Amino acid sequence: MFAEFLLYLFPNIVTSMKRLLSIMVLSVLVVACSSQPKRAASVPQIVEPIKYAYSVKAIYPHDTTSYTQGLQYVDGVLWEGTGEWGKSVLQKVDLQSGRAEVLTTLPRSEFGEGITVLGDKVYQLTWTNNKVHVYDLQGRHLKDMRYVGEGWGLTSDGESLYMSNGTTDIYKMDPETFKREGKITVTMRGEAVNFINELEWIDGRIWANVYTTDYVIIINPQTGVVEGYIDFTGLLKDEDVTERTDVLNGIAYDKDGGRIFVTGKLWNKLFEVEINK
């Protein structure tokens, strides 16, 4: 409780504290991507993840006051959930202009996290309040549900919800009760991947930001194995980076148009990218 109170009093400590993790997390990912697996007869074959390249297809403006925690594109609407104490909102964003229509503002005591749309409901996590807010598609509050631990990223396969909490695990959640139905432990080349953050379901796989890095990993939800990854280092150019610009975070998939969008916390741009081997 004391640590949470400090975070509430000093919101800037959140970014500073988490940034200290970046070198450690990036080092783990580099080792996972480059090291050779140990060979032993009793060890199952380790999947070699595919390193995908990307190209930028289009660039759109993004509100530099939006600390992006969740992003989703559904039926022509770009949904965004943002964080920071006293600034967390759920909003709809006009893709072309970047203008946001705020639908609801969270209490000052809540730090907004991942969002997802499932059917006629929108779900929005909170970081340390152990609470998910449920809204209708107009942003009207319907109910809250409780969960154990922190909330980070959220996505859906069309039936169930999947939630990350900043660890190596992704939990399958019942959308009606928000009770845990299963757990996926994420591994890359046999090594656990920590700090799983924002999530997006794309063609039967879970795409995830790895917090404090420029990596997006592609996870098999049946096994937890990382089958591929994209390194977005350099996506946001140096001239677009300010003192407030934070890490890559936010993946949205336009299923009908086959488009993938990525952005970051307090970034001035949102990118449509094409992924290639």
Task: Go through each PLM region and give its residues.
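A short helix->beta-strand "capping" segment at the edge of beta-propeller domains
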Residues: 45-64, 95-98
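Conserved beta-strand position repeated across blades of beta-propeller domains
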Residues: 72, 114-116, 155, 200, ...
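C-terminal motif of bacterial Sec signal peptides marking the signal peptidase cleavage site
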Residues: 31-32
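Surface loop/turn motifs at the tips and blade-to-blade linkers of beta-strand repeat domains
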Residues: 59-64, 104-108, 143-148, 185-191, ...
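Conserved beta-strand positions in repeat-built beta-propeller and related beta-rich domains
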Residues: 80-84, 122-129, 161-167, 208-212, ...
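Signature of short aromatic-glycine-proline-rich micro-motifs recurring in repeat-based ectodomains
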Residues: 68, 196, 243-252
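Short coil/turn segments that connect the beta-strands within blades of beta-propeller domains
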Residues: 75-76, 119-120, 158-159, 203-204, ...
